[in-house]
């Protein structure tokens, strides 16, 4: 059986989901996997030794502080004209690859063009998506253009996702749904998207105890451990690293915290970047789930996958969404609303504010209760298994 997996290449969350799904599909029958993606996603797949097919990049312009540059992004896309050309080129590549490979199933993770290509070739298709409604940041100079672009994306993308034979949203059921705002759509879409829960490669019960994992990392069981994997697009990472690492280094010394930072650089392996006092910075953490279970608090940028993984492992979070990144901002505010996280805006970052937030997350029982409940719910769900079974079923006709 051949599977054509088409994840969005911005960041690593989408490709990791597809990698998990391929492993679960192989529990049912032998599967050859072909990953058609771009950007960081393509680099990750190549590094992992999987079959990687490059498609045309889609880039988002960023400011030096990690903020999404809405005006420049729209301008570089020719206010839609260049974007149409990019879509056409990507569609041609997908059609060419699919025609050559002859896949039994196409799996798109937030890549609408692959769904279109699959339907043009009459191939069965599964779609994974958690952001169905796109909110574009509203800047005064670009207000009209932003509104038009937002309306156009909702009107275009929604029907494309529905072209797939099955559409899955990898998120918690209510009241713990993190992508709730991004799923608010006209009634036409009601019942067309299936909430299946978080997609995990490893479940908490498959790993050793938190105490044992801490000891393996050189941390005493009673010492508070903070884990900060630097996630998101490569253009937004440098500013956040320069801002947060000195703050955490001072807090490690002042508060007696242990901190592990991963720079999100799989190309460098698990090489130690530097170590100072209670803070250890690595280029990449191979066993993300071991560090997640070992930690007491996760610091992340509001990415959907990272939030769901932390909730599944019972870990409260400090979320720092990038400026003007509406999806991560909405994810973060929703996580705060359900009681599993505190949120700091990027301009609020300082030793005092971060220290206060971490103390609350470590000490206040309300956070432990909320993540305990989300962990219980996650233990009853198997999103990867549900999607894998449906993909194999569709591939088998």
Predicted regions and their residues:
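A short, glycine/small-residue-rich beta-strand->loop->alpha-helix junction that serves as a flexible
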Residues: 7-19, 234-239
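Conserved nucleotide-sugar phosphate-binding/catalytic loop shared by glycosyltransferases and other
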Residues: 9, 27, 31-85, 229-232
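Conserved nucleotide-sugar donor-binding subdomain of glycosyltransferases
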Residues: 70-105, 112-113
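A donor-sugar binding/catalytic signature common to diverse glycosyltransferases
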Residues: 105-109, 135, 287-330
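Conserved donor-nucleotide binding/catalytic region of nucleotide-linked donor-dependent transferases
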Residues: 342, 347, 352-374, 397
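C-terminal alpha-helical cap of glycosyltransferases
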Residues: 380-397
């Amino acid at each position: 059986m051949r599977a054509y997996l088409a994840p969005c290449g911005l960041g690593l969350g989408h490709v990791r989901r597809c990698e998990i799904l391929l492993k679960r599909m192989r529990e049912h029958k032998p599967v050859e996997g072909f990953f058609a993606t771009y950007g960081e996603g393509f680099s990750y797949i190549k590094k992992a030794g999987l079959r990687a097919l490059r498609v045309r990049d889609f880039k988002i312009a960023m400011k030096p502080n990690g903020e999404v540059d809405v005006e420049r992004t729209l301008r570089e896309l020719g206010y839609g004209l260049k974007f149409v050309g990019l879509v056409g080129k990507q569609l041609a590549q997908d059609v060419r690859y699919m025609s050559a490979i002859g896949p039994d199933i196409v799996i798109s993770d937030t890549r609408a063009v692959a769904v279109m290509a699959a339907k043009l070739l009459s191939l069965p298709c599964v779609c994974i998506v958690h952001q169905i409604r796109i909110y574009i940041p509203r800047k005064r100079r670009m207000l009209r253009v932003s509104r038009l672009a937002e309306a156009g994306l909702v009107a275009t993308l929604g029907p494309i996702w529905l072209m797939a034979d099955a559409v899955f949203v990898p998120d918690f059921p209510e009241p713990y749904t993190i992508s709730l705002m991004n799923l608010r759509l006209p009634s036409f879409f009601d019942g067309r998207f299936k909430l299946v829960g978080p997609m995990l490669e490893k479940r908490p019960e498959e790993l050793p105890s938190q105490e044992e994992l801490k000891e393996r990392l050189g941390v005493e069981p009673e010492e508070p451990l903070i884990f900060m994997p630097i996630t998101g697009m490569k253009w937004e990472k440098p500013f956040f690293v320069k801002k947060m690492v000195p703050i955490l280094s001072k807090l490690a010394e002042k508060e007696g915290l242990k901190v592990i930072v991963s720079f999100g650089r799989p190309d460098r392996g698990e090489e130690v970047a530097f170590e100072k006092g209670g803070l250890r910075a690595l280029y990449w953490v191979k066993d993300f789930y071991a560090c997640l279970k070992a930690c007491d608090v996760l610091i992340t940028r509001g990415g959907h996958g990272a939030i769901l993984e932390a909730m599944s492992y019972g870990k409260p979070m400090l979320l720092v969404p990038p400026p003007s990144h509406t999806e991560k901002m909405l994810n973060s505010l929703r996580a705060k609303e359900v009681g599993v996280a505190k949120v700091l805006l990027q301009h609020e970052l300082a030793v005092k504010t971060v220290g206060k937030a971490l103390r609350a997350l470590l000490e206040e029982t309300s956070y432990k209760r909320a993540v305990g409940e989300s962990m219980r719910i996650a233990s009853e769900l198997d999103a990867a298994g549900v999607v894998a079974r449906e993909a194999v079923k569709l591939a088998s006709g």
